[in-house]
Amino acid sequence: MGSGFGGSVAALRLAEKGYRVTVVEAGRSWRPEDFATSAWQARHLLWAPWLGWRGIARLRVRRRLVALTGVGVGGGSLVYAGVHHRPDGAVFREACWDPTLDWESELAPAYALAERILGTTRVPRQAAGDDVLRRTAAALGVPGAVHAARVGIHFGPAGRTVPDPFFDGRGPARAGCTECGRCTLGCRVGAKNSLDHNYLHLAQRAGAEIRPLTEARKLVPQPDGTWHVHTRHGTGITRTRTVLSAHQVVLAAGAWGTAELLHRSQPYLPHLSAALGTRTRTNREVFAAVSADGFDVGPGVAISSVLRPRSDLLVQLCRLGPGTHPAALLARPGGSSWRDFGRRTAVLLAMEQGDSHLTSHYRRGSLTFRPGGPHPEPVRLASAEAVAHDYALRIDGRAALLWNTVLRLPVTAHLLGGCPIGSRPATSVADLYHRVHGYPSLHVIDASAVPGNLGVNPALTVTALAERACATWPAADRPDQRPAQGEPYRRVRGDLSGTAQGA
C-alpha cells in the first residue's frame, strides 16, 4: 500500500526474493513533462480530486496540525527536494528508539545501500544565497558549520539526456540538472532521482505490478491466514471497487495514510496495539522567508546548503524557483511587490531534535490529533528565527515566518510516526522486524514506523529502515529465520549488498 520510500524498497526487494508483488498507489503516474511549470498551476501540483486536481502534493489542515504529503507513483519523492542526510547519532540514543538495538550501527549498511540506489551526492555548485548563509554562520560564531547539501540529483551536463548513469544500463535515461530550483514542483528535466527512476523502475523490471489511482480503504484478515484488501480505483464520481487477496501486506502509505488505514480497519483487527496513532511527529519544522529588493538567491537546486549551528538543529537554504509564488500571499517581508518573489527570496527550513509528539484518532472518516505529551509540537523555534533574522541583516532585508505563524499551527512536510516500531506491544504498533504486533503477516514499512523526530529530512532514514526490514524477509521459497512474535529479538543477517537486479 503506497509507492514512497518504504513501499518502493519493499516492491523491489520482495520481487527480487520471488514474491508476486502488487503496489497500490492512490495517485497517478507522472512523466517529467506532466509536472507543473509554476507553483500557481494548482491542478498539476495539489491533490484535490473533487476539484479535478490530481497533483503530487496533498495538503491537510487539522485543528492541531498542517501536513503536506506526496501522492503519486513515487510518493513523497515526487515533491521532495531530494535531500539525503543521516541524523545525528544522538537521535538513536533517545528513549523513543528501542534500546534492544544499537540503531546507529544497525542502520549503517542500510544507509550506505540507500545512498547508492538513490544516487546521493554533494551539491557541486553554490550561489549567492549559499554565500549569505556562510556569512550568517560566521556572524553566529560557527563559521565551519555550513556544508553543501547531500542530494539525490543527477548533475550531468545540464539538460542533456544520457543513458542510465546509475545501474549499468538497467535504469532509465537521465538528464543533467539545470539548477532551476523547482525540485519540489516535480522535476520536469528528469534530473531528480525520484523513486520512479530507481527503486520502482527496478521493481517493475523484477516483475512488480504498480496500480496507480487505486486507494486501499480497508484491511480484513481471513480465516485461512490471507488478507482481503478493499480498494477503490479512480477519482471521479464513478469508482471501481475491488478486493485484492494477499498472503503478506506491506503498509507504506506514509505516516498519515498508514495510520488512517489502520484506524479505519480497527474493527477487523481486535489485536491491534493501543499504541496506534501515538508518537506522531512533525520533525519540529519551521519555515521562514527572507527577502529583499535587489537580492538574487541565485541558481541552484531547491535545497543547496545546510547550516548546523548546534548538533540538534539543522537550517537549510531553500529556493522557490524564479517567478512569483503562492508563498508571497503569506509573507512579503522584503517589500510590497510580489513580482519575482521566488528569485529574491531565500526560504530557511529549520528542523530540530526533540521529544514533542501528537496522538492521532479517527473521527468522521479522517484523522484528528491531540497532544501526545507535555511537550507540544512547535509553532516557532527561537533559534531558527535568530538565524533567519541574521540572514536578513546580510542582505538588508526582512525575515518572516511563513505558514506556522499565519496558521498558528505546527506545519510539516515530513510527518513521522503514528505506528512506531519497538519490542513491546504496549508502546509500539510493529515489532523490530516491522511486523504488526498480533498480525505477523502485516508489515509497516514507511515513515509511520519512525519512532522519533530525526532533526533532518527523513527520506534517507525511511529508505534505510525499509532496506533493513526487507533484508530480514526470507526468499519466497525459504523458511522464515525471524523469531515468532513474542519470542526474544534475534538478529537476522540479511543481504544488504543490493547486488540483485544490478541494484
Predicted features and spans:
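Conserved redox-cofactor binding core of oxidoreductases
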Residues: W103-L213, V406-A413, P420
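Intrinsic disorder at enzyme termini
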Residues: W473-G502
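A glycine-rich dinucleotide-binding beta-alpha-beta segment and adjacent secondary-structure elements
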Residues: A149, C180-C183, V220-P221, V379-G452
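FAD cofactor-binding and catalytic pocket of flavoenzymes
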Residues: V61, G76, Y80, F92, ...
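Short, hydrophobic/aliphatic alpha-helical segments
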Residues: W53-T69, R239-A246, P309, N404, ...
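N-terminal glycine-rich phosphate/pyrophosphate-binding loop and immediately adjacent elements
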Residues: M1-A95, P99-L101, S105, T231, ...
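Glycine-rich loop(s) and the adjacent beta-strand/alpha-helix scaffold that form part
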Residues: E16, R20, G27-P32, T37, ...
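A short acidic-Thr-Gly-centered motif at the start of a beta-strand
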Residues: A11-E16, Y199-Q204, G234-V243, I421, ...
